[in-house]
Amino acid sequence: MASELVPVSASVVSTGLGIRYVGDYCYAYSGEHDVSNSEITLLEDTTGSGLIRGHAQFGYGEPTGEDFRYLIYFNDLIVLNQVASGTTDTPIGPMFYALIIPPFTKVKLTAENLSSSNAREHTALLTGRVYGV
């Protein structure tokens, strides 16, 4: 069965907590969120019936010298715990992680400022190909 194409006039680009599906692909873009010294959810949703082979990425573009923790959860279990140490000279580069996400999995991406209570803008994205739908 061939996937239906999304018409050019359709608006499929948006931000928010959820995963969106277009044909055999999925994506989620968090938009910018202020991250301070408590864990902030950037993306959260439960996947559908297909397996997702994809990538997650965290972004932060303001050089402040602060340290941040990025977490990826599957069904409330931590599958990735990354601490990025900042410098005042260069921003923390994009952190890019390959993922295989099983069907019907609750996925959550979070960030936390470990060095300061100052709020800093962060983004997260999840993109992938969906198999077995």
Give each language-model segment a name.
Residues 1-133:
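Beta-strand-centric surfaces of beta-sandwich/beta-rich domains
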